[in-house]
Amino acid sequence: MAEYCAAVPQTSSAELSGLLRRYYQDSGVRKRMCEFLGGTDLKHATALYIAGTDGYSDYQVQSPPTDLIEYLEGALEVDRSLWDTQSLIADIDLEYHNFDYPAAPWRDPARAFQLQQPVLDATLQILGKAGIAPLTLVSGRGFHLVWAVLRKSGAFRHLARLGRVPASLKSRNAQACAPNGASVDPDLACAFSGLGLIMEFVGHLVLEASMERCLLPVQPAAIEVGPGIYGREIISLDLSEYGDSLHTRHVRIPFSAYLKPRQFEWMFGESEVRRLLPIFEIPLSDMAPAQAITAMRDPDAVLEIAQHVSAAIPDQSEAMEELLDNYEHSELAIFHDQFYMQLREGTSLPNCSIPTPPCAQFLLEKPNDWLLKPAALQHIVRVLTAIGWSPSSIAHRICASYSKDCDWGNTWDRLEPCSRAIFYTRLFAGMIATGLDKLIDFNCVSHQEKGYCMIPDCSSNLILYRDMLLGKRKST
């Protein structure tokens, strides 16, 4: 694997903090951050909150946007909430994952970004056909494509009509969810749910368009695969943010430092982390990705970009209408309607003569933290669909596992179990129903390679379950 950072001098933690404090004093950087927060100044920002981290953990403190200067003086990485007072913020998260060598995209960014190019091209082409021109941000492992739908627009009302919010999430949204004590408006929660359906539709189109052109598996979340020469690596068009509550999700602010390598200091050492940083989040603008991955590691180059490249989130309300129309005439929309109809009507567990294989039963009985992982949820949906469970029954079964007393800690303070079970069941069952899931890795060897086979000596053979699914597909 190429050593992109081999010639980069090491920067100590104290030196990096000093560099970031000086960098953050730049008026151009602060101006662009305010743009992304939705205002000309921090007092008029439309983002509900910002969140900062020193990079060493996932923990982030939420504060009002007016606290931005304090965060910058602390040399932090800074995010903004997807939750906004004026708009529904859409975000597509595209990135390279290597489950065996997490440092791979930082040590050899040229390779990681080149591998993503077919997926980025497909995403921009599909959005472009609908007239959507997002703000494209370059991050440490990939891209964020961000745009806004004004809450006063017809597209927002259309999304709100499409959205389905479970009663448990409605109750959660009614509580104080922001630093200022605000709760999530019901219409906004419905629109965010509707946006999740549209993003799932976009995901289907992108995966279908790019899977033959991309050298790596393209997944709708961080789903492990079998190993290749460079380890278990994928390109993820990550839809997982639409399975969580709106108030919990945020996106890194352009021109913020990118400090995620610090999370892995325990794995590859302090000296390696020093070699990898600094990295900054920047708009792609008119640069090629190869230019961007060089510029984002050079503070002076980033400061120059901040002088002339806007970070305002573009309003794409009108263009969203065409994407909505395309979705409503799709096979996926039909599946979604049937899925939610089953959920409303209620469902009983099927009488199955075919046993659930031990690997799936293990995941259901040990949900913490197995059923917090997308690959495990995909496996459950595949197996139970094969033996005759309806998608709504599967969602109820996963939710029942989430309800077990399994030392969850504060997990369900941050996440909402019912909506999470519904989202991942819908996502993976929809891929089966439309034929997007080719089931190539639905076998015992692949399951072992992914790291999810906890009972290797069982007598079950997942090929039999895959054949059942393929048989169902041929008969429909």
Model-predicted regions and their roles:
Residues R111-G131, F192-V206:
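Long, well-ordered alpha-helical scaffolding segments within enzyme catalytic domains
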Residues A189-S193, R274, I279, P283-L284, ...:
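Basic, alpha-helical nucleic-acid-binding regions used in initiation and control of genome expression
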Residues L124-L127, V138, R151:
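Long alpha-helical, hydrophobic tracts
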Residues A133-S139, G243:
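Short beta-strand
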Residues M1-A112, R151-G194, M211, L215-W266, ...:
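DNA replication initiation on ssDNA origins
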Residues E73, E200, R252-F255, A375-I387:
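Short, hydrophobic/amphipathic alpha-helical patches that form generic packing surfaces
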Residues S139-W147:
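Short, conserved phosphate-binding/catalytic loop or strand-edge motifs used
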Residues L82-L88, L115, V138, D369-K373:
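Secondary-structure capping and boundary motifs in well-ordered enzyme cores
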